[in-house]
């Protein structure tokens, strides 16, 4: 399938913007198989097991989103398709340097998609749909329709109206500011766009009536000016940026025998988590359509971006949004779903006052003190122990259990609690038993040796980690097998502190021990720690 000259010119400009503005490929936590598996499970689907999934990313750039996933998920397989030969070559060099054999980048145009690649459990297209032609949009959904496993999950993100109407004003201002300046590089055009935008915004702020009338525009303008140059060049100066309404995207899915599941931001999907008045009105406006309710919600929230989770039409019959209804959270089907997850609390103890039920509050406090990761068996055991310690009435127990389920679901939706069916591997450091496997060390070394120009490091949740350092790499290389604390401290002192003659041996030991304590905790947080059976300390 051949492209027209306009699309070829658009592709060329995109690649020029990438090169001139120093684009880096981000990891995104909401695109991982474990994340998508959990969200599909939440609404009643039975997605493929994340641990051994086969994953395709379309528009993979340098591979920054899937290389990190491959490091943390060695039993899964990842394939990225990218138009730019330069980005594919650089990404594959990072993969080679990291010695990874479960991820690859392929140069190709999705219009000429290689059908021999077969089917995938999960298909990802982040930051792609809004920046391609209608023909390519059709092809993207055609690939998902024909290459997604029957119970598979896909993810597509895109800019949305109505919120992007205001952003479109900012985009048009920046395009107008650069009209007639074809000789400028894209970096210079971004600078000119930001400068002109600042001048226009400053003039509006000089007049109270204009400031009030243009408050939304000023907010959007301020947001864009503060963004990285790459984002501004990509979203506001590329020739193609095509937002749509959510209902239009949903209609496009239906045309390809695909169905919408929910958004990766559950607050856009679980309308019952808003107050009853909003939920009741949305249900009256669209009593039999989840998608229409979400479209009305987009009008209310002025939504600018969506991260849609998708399945095949044939699987959609199992979808239920009962988990979002507080009146149904404590039914057997919903409790069964909630019981299948492992959770991580993201709020701290200062937020506990939001829980009215004292037993629920005590339960969350105990869970946070224990590290914040738990399952429902553990949470219910803690709740029961708190109930018994308080000598509370037996009649108080079941209401507290109901309140606990409601609280957990509410914060799953609002983002205060992460949840997974396949929880990313995170282990505590144990002296003499724990070590850093070579795959993590090789990954960090590949980043340190030049890969950081193109991709970020990431933890086990695929959150970007931008501060990976030579000290991290040194520690990882030292902890290549289980070692005694004393051995590690001596090696750290010899490597980092022994040359400092201004410090006594005692001070050097203290600094080495502090470094050891800090780095073992950091390795835990990054998900780089694994444990071997105790074969003796070395």
Language model features: what each stretch is:
Residues 20, 24-52:
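Conserved alpha-helix/loop element of class I SAM-dependent methyltransferases that forms part
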Residues 62-75:
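Conserved SAM-binding loop of SAM-dependent methyltransferases across substrates and taxa
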Residues 84:
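Conserved SAM/SAH-binding beta-strand->alpha-helix loop
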Residues 99-110:
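Conserved SAM-binding strand-loop segment of SAM-dependent methyltransferases
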Residues 115-123:
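A short acidic, Gly/Pro-enriched loop at the edge of an enzyme's catalytic core
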Residues 138-150:
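A short glycine-rich, Lys/Arg-flanked "PGG" loop and its adjoining helix->strand segment in the class I
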Residues 156-183, 203:
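Conserved class I S-adenosyl-L-methionine
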Residues 271-286, 290-306, 310, 349-538:
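Long, charge-rich, low-complexity alpha-helical segments
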């Amino acid at each position: 399938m051949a492209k027209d000259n306009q699309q070829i010119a658009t592709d060329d400009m995109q690649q020029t913007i990438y090169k001139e503005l120093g684009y880096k490929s981000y990891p995104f936590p909401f695109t991982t198989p474990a994340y998508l598996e959990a969200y599909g499970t939440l609404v009643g689907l039975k997605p493929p097991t994340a641990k051994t999934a086969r994953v395709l990313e379309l528009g993979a750039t340098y591979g920054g989103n899937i290389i990190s996933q491959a490091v943390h998920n060695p039993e899964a397989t990842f394939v990225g398709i990218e138009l730019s030969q330069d980005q594919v070559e650089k990404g594959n060099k990072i993969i080679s340097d990291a010695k990874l054999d479960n991820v690859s980048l392929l140069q190709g145009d999705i219009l000429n998609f290689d059908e021999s690649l077969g089917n995938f459990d999960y298909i990802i297209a982040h930051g792609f749909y809004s920046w391609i032609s209608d023909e390519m949009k059709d092809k993207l959904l055609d690939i998902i329709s024909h290459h997604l496993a029957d119970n598979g999950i896909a993810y597509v993100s895109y800019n949305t109206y109505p919120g992007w109407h205001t952003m479109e004003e900012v985009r048009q201002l920046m395009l107008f500011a650069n009209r007639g300046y074809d000789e400028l590089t894209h970096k210079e055009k971004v600078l000119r766009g930001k400068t002109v935008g600042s001048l226009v915004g400053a003039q509006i702020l000089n007049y109270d009536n204009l400031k009030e009338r243009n408050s939304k525009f000023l907010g959007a303008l301020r947001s864009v000016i503060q963004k990285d140059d790459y984002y501004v060049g990509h979203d506001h100066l590329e020739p193609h940026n095509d937002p749509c309404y959510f209902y239009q995207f949903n209609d496009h899915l239906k045309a390809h025998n695909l169905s919408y599941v929910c958004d990766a931001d559950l607050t856009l999907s679980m309308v019952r988590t808003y107050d009853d008045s909003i939920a009741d009105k949305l249900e009256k406006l669209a009593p039999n359509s989840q998608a229409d309710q979400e479209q009305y919600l987009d009008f209310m929230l002025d939504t600018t971006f969506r991260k849609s989770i998708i399945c095949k039409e044939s699987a959609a019959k199992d979808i239920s949004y009962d988990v979002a209804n507080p009146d149904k959270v404590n039914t057997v089907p919903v409790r069964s779903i909630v019981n299948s997850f492992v959770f991580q609390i993201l709020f701290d103890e200062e937020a506990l006052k939001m829980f009215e039920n004292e037993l629920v509050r005590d339960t969350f406090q105990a869970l946070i003190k224990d590290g914040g990761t738990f399952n429902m068996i553990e949470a219910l055991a803690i709740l029961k122990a708190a109930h018994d310690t308080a000598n509370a009435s037996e009649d108080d127990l079941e209401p507290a259990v109901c309140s606990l389920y409601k609280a957990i679901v509410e914060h799953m939706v609002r983002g205060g609690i992460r949840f997974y069916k396949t929880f990313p591997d995170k282990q505590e450091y144990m002296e003499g038993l724990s070590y850093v496997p070579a795959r993590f060390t090789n990954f960090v070394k590949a980043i340190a040796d030049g890969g950081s120009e193109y991709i970020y490091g990431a933890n086990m949740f695929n959150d970007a980690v931008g501060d990976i350092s030579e000290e991290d790499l040194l520690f990882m290389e030292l902890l290549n097998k289980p070692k005694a604390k004393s051995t590690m401290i001596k090696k750290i002192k010899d490597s980092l502190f022994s040359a400092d003659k201004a410090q006594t041996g005692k001070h050097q030991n203290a600094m080495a021990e502090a470094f050891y304590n800090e780095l073992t905790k950091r390795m835990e947080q990054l998900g780089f720690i694994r444990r071997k059976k105790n074969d003796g300390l070395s």
